[in-house]
Amino acid sequence: MSRSRSAAASSSQKPDDMDLMSPDGSASSPSAPNTPATNSGGFSSDRKKATHLRCERQRREAINSGYSDLKDLIPQTTTSLGCKTTNAAILFRACDFMSQLKTDISDADKQLAQLNAQAAALEMIASEYEQMASSVPDAGQSTIQVKMLQLLLDDCFTSFSSQVDFTTYATITRTLLSWVESLAPNAEPFKSTAGKMVTMPFTSP
């Protein structure tokens, strides 16, 4: 009786033992977790996170470097000395400095226009001098005429410099006409110059 029970128990355990064996006779566990796949997924997630952190760090370093370069380009002001420099303060100073540069450029353009107008007027005077000089006889022929012409031109240039406004082309035209009228024979400045020409002591060569 006990022998038959032992045989039955042995036969009931054989199917379980056979389930634990693989077709090639090795033991296997069908419910064991897939460890390599799990590790691979975790490694990929860590790598993405590390890449994201590295990119974010590089982005912040680039921003900080840009702010540092901008800070070096902006001149220091008395109000910024001794104060903590923030990014907002750097941007504010940059905007203020740009406004100042625009004002300086505008003033420089106005000054350049004024200098160009003055240069144009001086070129015109130089051209007139050249024409007058070409019509003057040789010094050996008429020294007195040369000295008279020199006195007249010097006096004219002095009055021209004091009466002609070189600010703009419009002011040059307006004041130049007034200056030309002052050279009329009946004008007092011309009479004064003519009197100097007549009374000055000339010496013959």
UniProtKB/Swiss-Prot annotation:
Region annotation (Basic motif) ranges: 47-60
CDD domains with a match to the protein in the record: bHLHzip_Mlx_like (cd11404)
Domain called bHLH: residue spans: 47-101
Composition bias type Low complexity, residue spans: 1-12, 26-40
Tissues expressing the protein: Widely expressed.
Biased composition (Basic and acidic residues): 45-58
Zinc-finger among keywords: no
Molecular functions per Gene Ontology: DNA-binding transcription factor activity, RNA polymerase II-specific; protein dimerization activity; RNA polymerase II cis-regulatory region sequence-specific DNA binding
InterPro entries according to UniProt: bHLH_dom, HLH_DNA-bd_sf, Max-like/E-box_TFs
Subcellular locations according to the entry: Nucleus; Cytoplasm; Mitochondrion
Location of the region described as Helix-loop-helix motif in the Swiss-Prot/TrEMBL record: 61-101
Signal peptide residues on this chain, from the entry's feature table: none
SUPFAM superfamilies the record matches: HLH, helix-loop-helix DNA-binding domain
Annotated GO biological process: determination of adult lifespan; negative regulation of gene expression; regulation of transcription by RNA polymerase II
UniProt keyword annotation of Signal present: no
Keywords: Coiled coil, Cytoplasm, DNA-binding, Mitochondrion, Nucleus, Transcription, Transcription regulation
Coiled coil: 98-132
PROSITE patterns: BHLH
SMART domains assigned: HLH
Chain spans, region Disordered: 1-58
Function noted in UniProt: Transcription factor. Binds to the E box motif 5'-CACGTG-3', probably in a heterodimeric complex with mml-1. Involved in modulating longevity in response to TOR signaling, dietary restriction, the decline in protein homeostasis associated with normal aging, germline signaling and the insulin-like signaling pathway. Plays a role in autophagy. Involved in regulating migration of the ray 1 precursor cells in the male tail, acting in concert with Wnt and semaphorin signaling pathways.
Protein's name in the database: Max-like protein homolog 2
UniProt organism field: Caenorhabditis elegans
